[in-house]
């Protein structure tokens, strides 16, 4: 049976995939910095869920990039629908910044948060996974949800997409894996830019796992 490596880690360090946490640390304090990054991301996601303008099942965050210096922590939030979070709120980013600072203790370091809009949100696997999760929570057929997600990626001019759902689908007693593919998804080609995400959704039947691979371009 073939072993599935994470396509992001497989391409990390090359031209197609960059690190989303940019900082250096001594080996003894590396784990502390890693936990700090996780707290920052969790605080941001919790704040977005509580303050956005639509259902709490859809955050619209593509990914979060963290850059650290000696006296500065810079956080860039790549979001597909920024109006859902900051529309009509002049101090939205300031409130988010204060909220994140409360979540972790930073000594002698400033925190700077910026929001960047993603040009084609439905070309981001995290946003698509959240969309599918929201549909599954609303008891929409999993096949219909997957096909609709593939239709949305056509707006982003992607070259291929693969969607996989695993678990007790439709409440069946035996867990199974269902997947659908449209276009090319060359996972073994290193020069191919592949976006990937794994997402967990809790339904009334149990936990379902969603995985999405998107073939963006080839160098």
UniProtKB/Swiss-Prot annotation:
Pfam families, sorted: Ribosomal_S3_C
Transmembrane segments: none
Key word Chloroplast present: yes
Cellular compartments per GO CC: chloroplast; cytosolic small ribosomal subunit
Location of the KH type-2 domain: 44-119
Matches recorded under InterPro entries: KH_dom-like_a/b, KH_dom_type_2, KH_sf_prok-type, Ribosomal_S3_C_sf, Ribosomal_uS3_bac-typ, Ribosomal_uS3_C, Ribosomal_uS3_CS
SUPFAM superfamilies per the UniProt record, alphabetical: Prokaryotic type KH domain (KH-domain type II) (SSF54814), Ribosomal protein S3 C-terminal domain (SSF54821)
UniProt KW Glycoprotein keyword: no
Gene Ontology MF annotations: rRNA binding; structural constituent of ribosome
Family in the record: Belongs to the universal ribosomal protein uS3 family.
UniProt xrefs under HAMAP family: Ribosomal_uS3_B
Protein name: Small ribosomal subunit protein uS3c
């Amino acid at each position: 049976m073939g072993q599935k490596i994470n396509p992001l880690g497989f391409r990390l360090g090359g031209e197609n995939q960059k690190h989303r946490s940019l900082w250096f640390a001594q080996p003894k304090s590396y784990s502390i910095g890693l936990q700090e990054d996780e707290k920052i991301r969790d605080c941001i996601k919790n704040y977005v869920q509580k303050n956005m303008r639509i259902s709490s099942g859809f955050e619209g965050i593509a990914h979060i990039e963290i850059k650290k210096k000696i006296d500065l922590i810079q956080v860039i939030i790549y979001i597909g629908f920024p109006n859902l979070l900051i529309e009509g709120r002049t101090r939205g980013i300031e409130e988010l910044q204060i909220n994140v600072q409360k979540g972790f203790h930073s000594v002698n370091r400033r925190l700077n948060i910026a929001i960047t809009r993603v040009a084609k949100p439905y070309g981001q696997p995290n946003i698509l996974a959240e969309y599918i999760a929201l549909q599954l929570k609303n008891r929409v057929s999993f096949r219909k949800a997957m096909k609709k997600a593939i239709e949305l990626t056509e707006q982003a001019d992607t070259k291929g997409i693969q969607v996989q759902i695993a678990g007790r689908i439709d409440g069946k007693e035996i867990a199974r894996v269902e997947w659908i593919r449209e276009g090319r998804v060359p996972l073994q080609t290193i020069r191919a830019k592949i976006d990937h995400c794994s997402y967990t959704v809790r339904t009334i039947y149990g936990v379902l796992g969603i995985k999405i691979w998107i073939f963006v371009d080839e160098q």
